[in-house]
Amino acid sequence: MKSIAVTGYKNFELGIFKKDADEAVYIKETIKRHLLPLVEDGLEWVIISGQLGIELWAGDVVAELKADYPIKLAILEPFEKQSANWNEANQLWASEVLEKADYHAFITKRPYESPAQFAARDGFIIDNTDGALLVYDLEKEGSPKFFYDRATQAKEQSNYYIDCIDFYALQEVVEDMNQTF
């Protein structure tokens, strides 16, 4: 596998309102634990769309991994000015992750017009990656459902790789990290 998409809940869907909240430490560690074996097996690219929450935390994780591994980060935003209506702290977070990216592009080269741009993003990213790592629990629907459904279709048609991190997996990392301290 050469490329993987990472997506999941937006931070506010998880009740997290700061990028550096305590919960983010556990989420980032969980993402790292799932990415690291893939990176060690030759994963070259992690692709995110620059959404708040899981995707930007994944961008932070990839930036950390770059110190020791030849991994690259691509940010493929669904449209121009995605962060224009975000608060200042979230805009800063997005720009910090963007600075760490090895590649950046817009899937539709215009500002937001309709939800179809999100569907276009999902389709483009799935069509151009070998798999997806999702922080998504089937028991708690949210924004990742649309990507998950489309990725599941790709898996059925072309053996697309899906690694879904649910809340139980997150809880295991929390417990493991708390035992370590």
UniProtKB/Swiss-Prot annotation:
Pfam (any one): YpsA
Stated family: Belongs to the UPF0398 family.
InterPro entries in UniProt: YspA (IPR010697)
Protein name, as recorded: UPF0398 protein lmo1889
Domain of life: Bacteria
UniProt xrefs under Gene3D superfamilies: 3.40.50.450
